[in-house]
């Protein structure tokens, strides 16, 4: 079950290396120095560019999470108001039904 993506998918084990896009992640058994020599991806500008791209992605994700949080908070407020409105309507309908019963003579006035 260590190589599975989802619990219960033991028959469809997917190695985790298929989900990584870096060259180093696809060859985890080799040493980092050998990968750097083979692919030449360890110069300083490339690392800075990769870090900048990663920072942009993280910033984008955090702003999206903030937007989701605001949306969920707004939906929670709207749902709370709707629940209160439904409870008020229920109480008004019960009161109206009692009033109609008294006026039609079904139940005596209490």
From Swiss-Prot:
One Gene Ontology cellular component annotation held by this UniProt entry: viral envelope
GO biological process, one term: fusion of virus membrane with host plasma membrane
A Pfam family per the record: Vac_Fusion
Keywords associated with the record: Disulfide bond, Phosphoprotein, Virion
Places the protein is found: Virion
InterPro entries, A to Z: Chordopox_Fusion/A27
Record family assignment: Belongs to the orthopoxvirus OPG154 protein family.
Oligomeric form and interacting partners: Homohexamers, covalently linked. Interacts with OPG144 and OPG153.
Function summary: Structural protein involved in the envelopment of mature virion (MV) to form the wrapped virion (WV). The wrapping consists of the addition of Golgi membranes to the mature virion. Participates in mature virion (MV) movement within the infected cell. May play an indirect role in MV-cell fusion.
Protein name as catalogued: Protein OPG154
Source organism of this protein record: Monkeypox virus
Record gene name: OPG154
């Amino acid at each position: 079950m260590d190589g599975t993506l989802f619990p219960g998918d033991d028959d469809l084990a997917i190695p985790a290396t298929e989900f990584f896009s870096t060259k180093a992640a696809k060859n985890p058994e080799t040493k980092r120095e050998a990968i750097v020599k083979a692919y030449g991806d360890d110069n300083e500008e490339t690392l800075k560019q990769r870090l900048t791209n990663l920072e942009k992605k993280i910033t984008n994700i955090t702003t999206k999470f903030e937007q989701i949080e605001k949306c969920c908070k707004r939906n929670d407020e709207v749902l709370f108001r709707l629940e209160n409105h439904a409870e008020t309507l229920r109480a008004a309908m019960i009161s109206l039904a009692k009033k109609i019963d008294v006026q039609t003579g079904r139940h005596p006035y209490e």
